[in-house]
Amino acid sequence: MGQTVTTPLSLTLEHWEDVQRTASNQSVDVKKRRWVTFCSAEWPTFGVGWPQDGTFNLDIILQVKSKVFSPGPHGHPDQVPYIVTWEAIAYEPPPWVKPFVSPKLSPSPTAPILPSGPSTQPPPRSALYPALTPSIKPGPSPIMADLSLTFSQKTLRRTEDRDRPPLTEMATEKRPPPLLRFLPPLP
């Protein structure tokens, strides 16, 4: 009568539909083969203590996540869906994971708590000052003023366009307009 050892990886594979549902809730898609590869071969090489059989330890998962999300060539964007799914399973464990997750401890204070009493220091003061903005004079905006010009006035204002032929001439030309000249001919 052989008994098998249950590991985080084997447990997730036994409940694969739940894993995929969790991934879907994270708006990602995971494949079983890559799930096994990342868990058993990739993440153990990151040097953060990830075991080949997986873990539900959030500290280790977050360290792997940090490596996966590293910018540039050190990151692993193809592994993002997988590590965020592991994290989601460990953070809000389904019933089949709960026996394998250590209870969350309330964070202990890292600095000593000072006794409360009358303070000898003056209250802190802010060095912030209100921003001074220039006053805006009411009047027509340049856009609205431009709308009042006639077509011929606008044409004259465009000095950079004076050497171009008018649109009416371009419509009667035998060659295509300037932008279409650079496109390959249609078959």
From Swiss-Prot:
GO terms for biological process: viral budding via host ESCRT complex. The record marks Y129, P130 as: Cleavage. It holds the Pfam family Gag_MA. It comes from Friend spleen focus-forming virus (isolate 502). GO terms for cellular component: host cell plasma membrane; membrane; virion component. Gag polyprotein plays a role in budding and is processed by the viral protease during virion maturation outside the cell. During budding, it recruits, in a PPXY-dependent or independent manner, Nedd4-like ubiquitin ligases that conjugate ubiquitin molecules to Gag, or to Gag binding host factors. Interaction with HECT ubiquitin ligases probably link the viral protein to the host ESCRT pathway and facilitate release. One of its GO terms (molecular function) is RNA binding. This is Gag polyprotein. SUPFAM superfamilies: Retroviral matrix proteins. It comes from the Viruses. Specific enzymatic cleavages by the viral protease yield mature proteins. The protease is released by autocatalytic cleavage. The polyprotein is cleaved during and after budding, this process is termed maturation. Keywords: Host cell membrane, Host membrane, Host-virus interaction, Lipoprotein, Membrane, Myristate, RNA-binding, Viral budding, Viral budding via the host ESCRT complexes, Viral matrix protein, Viral release from host cell, Virion. A motif (PTAP/PSAP motif) lies at residues 109-112. Residues 107-187 are annotated as: Disordered. A lipid is attached at G2 (N-myristoyl glycine). InterPro entries: G_retro_matrix, G_retro_matrix_sf, Retroviral_Gag-Pol_poly, Retrovr_matrix. Residues 157-176 have a biased composition (Basic and acidic residues). A motif (LYPX(n)L motif) lies at residues 128-132. Late-budding domains (L domains) are short sequence motifs essential for viral particle budding. They recruit proteins of the host ESCRT machinery (Endosomal Sorting Complex Required for Transport) or ESCRT-associated proteins. Matrix protein p15 contains one L domain: a PTAP/PSAP motif, which potentially interacts with the UEV domain of TSG101. The junction between the matrix protein p15 and RNA-binding phosphoprotein p12 contains one L domain: a LYPX(n)L motif which interacts with PDCD6IP. The gene is gag.
